[in-house]
Amino acid sequence: MSMRHKVGTIAGTMAVSLAFIPGTASAHSLSFNQKAAAYVKQFVGRVPYVYGGSSPSGFDCSGLTSYVYRHYGKSIPRTADAQFRRFHRESEGRAWGGDLVFFHVNSNPNSYVTHVGVYEGGHHMVAATHPGGGIRWQTIYSSNVTFGTITH
């Protein structure tokens, strides 16, 4: 067996093995996260905030997240709090771009969720902010947040 074949076999075995370790992502889920994180950016500065909005003519926060996820075949609830109740919780250190950031009314991580955005990594997110604010790429401005995933 040539050295090139041995290295390829070892690398292939490692890649296959990682797909079955809990807490690691499959190629499919990583691909979804990357796509969702990239897709949501097209709305930044181009789409207004509309309370109850769930289309590119105007979004509210949970309308934006549900629209992005639905674009890739992932059906999630329509409201921020209902989305939070459906997602698996992660620490920011384990969250990936494309996961969601949930904002709570207080420091209790089980408290009601009032806002949601798409995590972009590096303590940043894309979210529908408020009337007049539209869709923005912004720093996560609160410590009362939980990160959530349905993909890994």
Ranges and model annotations:
Residues 74-135:
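...with weaker cross-activation on analogous glycine-rich loops/strands in unrelated enzymes
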Residues 2-4, 10-12, 23-41, 46-49, ...:
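Aromatic- and glycine-rich peptidoglycan recognition patches
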Residues 42-97:
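Catalytic cysteine-centered active-site loop
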Residues 1-2, 81:
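General helical secondary-structure elements
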Residues 19-21:
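Structural signal for the C-terminal ends of transmembrane alpha-helices
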